[in-house]
Amino acid sequence: WYTVDGIFTRKSSSSRPRHLTNDDLSNHYTRGVSYKEIFPNKELGTNDNTTLPVLNLAFYPNERGPYNLDAENVNSDGTLGNPEKRWGGVMRKIEPSDLESANYEYIEFWLLDPYLEDETAEGGDLYFNLGEISEDILKDERKFFENGMPVDGDMSKVDTTVWGKVPRTQSTGYAFDAQNRELQDVGLNGLSTEEEQIFPTYADYLNKLRAKLSGETISKMMDDPFSPFNDPAGDNYHYFRGDDYDAKELDILSRYKRYNGTEGNSQESDQRYATAGKSTPDVEDINGDNTLNETEKYFEYKISLRPKDLQVGVNNIVDERTPEVTLMNGDKEKVKWYLFKIPIKDYEKRVCLLYTSPSPRD
């Protein structure tokens, strides 16, 4: 989940990698989207940005995500088995928290046709959960916050869980030690990549994974800095720019695959530009109230993203637009946008779950 940076959407950008052509910049899922494309009657001032900040959600169901230690359902080439059973999700704080009192009535958004490049795709489902969602991302009933990791090497200040290390201290705020940021910016498991290599949970995962893979796959993975053998937890961060990315001539989508990593996402840069994804520690405290919420109590809304269900009048779709857009390569193409408007009162399911603490392989 990300917003594509302007260096990839502005035609005049001097920072764009040279190998990216105008054809690359014309991909509908990474190109810039103008206000007029969706809101043709919107009046813009002379100093207004004419490009919409689009939320991009990319899901690769046959590729491993952070802290996924499933070594059983893996193919010999390293891809995940049963991709149709995989899921991906994001969560964030919503303000105000009391939507009813604030008179919010709908979940409303425009969605670009997901099947512009593959009309034969079967599609899937998109869920929205509004309410209390557990902040315990790595299920251990302990709140992790990166700035709680000791910088003096005193391991009496941490406890060990099945996932890694967690601070024993209570959090009073979230800010890195100014002089030792690299010792704390280790991701939500409290372990650096080097520590993951020898930590029992990840070492066991790697042993089981190695037995499932072909020799050719293992050889390729050893050369991949983001493979499980070089990043056991799968939590390492990489900015969407980098000399290594340029050398590999990565496309725009591939450049954002590691952008949500939590280990190393606040480091100072040795590049000629800033590369940090954020300046604050990663924490299991989405709403910033200094507590760990473990409750699952929410309203669930479901929409189908199957091609046959993308039509006005059903599936909470209330409008559609088919503008003709001029792409960076000069081509003109028609694309379709769907307007979803989901009444908050019309939830599909009300969920209230008791907390359980599964193993990292569940």
Which ranges hold each PLM region?
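Extracellular/lumenal carbohydrate-interaction signature centered on repeated Trp-anchored short motifs
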Residues: 96-103, 331-334
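Conserved small/polar residues in nucleotide/adenosyl-binding loops
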Residues: 355-362
